Amino acid sequence: MKPGKRIGLLILAIALVAVIGISVYRMYQGGTAVATVPSAPAAVTEPPQTAQTKTEPAPTPTAEPAGPDYGDPTAWAYFALGEDKGVDVFLICPTVDTRSERNAYDLNEKLRSNFLYALDLEKGIYEEAGRLYSPYYRQMSINAYRLSDPDREKAKELAYSDISAAFRWYLDHENGDRPLILAGFSQGAEMCLELLKEFYGDTAEGNALRERLITVYAIGWRVTEADVQAYPQIVPAQGERDLGTVVSFDCEDGIVAETIILPAGVKTLSINPLNWKTDGTMADRSKNLGAVMATGAAPIPGLCGAYIGDRGQLVVTDVTAGEYPPALDVFPAGAYHVYDYMFFFMNLKQNLSDRVAAYDQARRGKVLCRLLEDLLMAYEQPGSEDETHIEADLSAIQAISEADYPVAKSIADHWRQVYLDPAYALCCHGEGDLAPELADAGIPNERTHAFVVLGYELQNGEMTDELKGRCEAAAAAARSFPNAILVCSGGATGPNNPEKHTEAGLMKQYLIEVCGIEESRIFTDERAMTTAENAVNTFAIMKEQGIESMTIVTSSYHQRWGQALYNALAAIYEQQQGYHARLIGNYCFDTQPSVEVFLKDDWFAIYQLGEILGLPRAQMDQLPNVYALLGM
């Protein structure tokens, strides 16, 4: 017997097939999820039930019992379970009640064990994200599907009223503005969609919740175009890292025409968990990282492939209905609903990790971009609230990333020094061969100090007077500090440069042939095309050469910009690589220092700071356009 067949029969054996001689048509119309999870082992002592051998359902109480008190931790199957990583998972159990007539009014010990058994099957997907919360609730039982449409709807409403109350309690007492993942299978998936409808709409709270929603795993249920149109907050996932979206699919063999999950004439908006595409592109079994068929079982890599069919169903390949029977007779052979997350367990687990990482990156980008924006606005339009905004930004960064905080604070402090402090002076080279202006700057005359010379765009493959002026300033500094080195940076720039001369290459040649600087003292970066690339490339050279301090040599209008970028990179290098190069003073080519007025090109300093910080381009593109602000 094949391993898959043994696994399928094992699941069939432990399932309480407590259903169901119910009209499939009526279930199609009911719109509520059905139980599809094997019961707890304690139930195995009872014989499997079929449409011919059913236990009579427990009658509905005359007076409806009160729902759980979610202020009591015993009302939760999982309560803050797992390591606190700053992310929570609100996980909703699928149907496990096969006894009650309508709803699970009596959440007794046996039923609670069924809850835990079902949840433990799924837990491995989600537990590495952070704390898990899963409420006991008066869920719909299998037998509720025998009821009339109005009574069946009442059963769903009662089940959801508990989920809603639990979620409300969680938000008020446990969430603390944490990012959140909603997850559920089958009935649990439908309840996740109901939470989106109630809590995530266009309200102040809903908008805030959507900002913190990492994703929704609503597996084993349907998401229709009508749902999306009626509730814009329900956004079907389109890829493997999009945020605030719904991951949904339900598995079939490609032959099944309809199920209670996906009735005839209904199309669901699914995503393939193997290739994260929403079209019919086939993902072969090699993309399957591993099926997990029982709690603690070893993954089975490459068990099956999948593609999305014309009804939106996820068609599973490489397995058969005989190997993986439906386990519940409410489903036809070939309906793999019970295996929805089991087949793709390791892919879902990896995807959860990817989405959390994407969320962290996006959240980091937002707060860092806000800081950059406020620094820019503080310089362009000074106001009394600037410092308040900047400090609030730094506090927000510290709250989400202790690692980013020292870098962000260094950026803010240095920006305030070079851009906002009127006392900050630019040191400009005169016309002599030496640099007496640097005498009091505290620059060491050591091989461990570097003068970093930033390039300027070439014209017709040749140096401009401005670039020559920067070289003259650098040469004066080199003569005044004969033990220091020079690092020239700049790639092949400018129009009409067929021989691809580089700024750095021509600077080196000029410094040697015209200025008389020893070649052994000059190092070059001939790749940089932006100031940010100047910083990145020259830092690599300085680290290799054991440089401990540096002074930027450039034009006066470019000095503050360069200072901001090099300081940011210095902070990042120190944090990430343990390498520190201290910025000392500045040296400029100019007859007069630039006056403290806004220079339109300094907008790019902020943009390039974003590049150095690794912020997503889409977020940087949302920074205010300074040209527009100034009418330039």
Q: What does each model-found stretch correspond to?
A:
Residues 174-184, 522, 550:
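Alpha/beta-hydrolase fold nucleophile elbow
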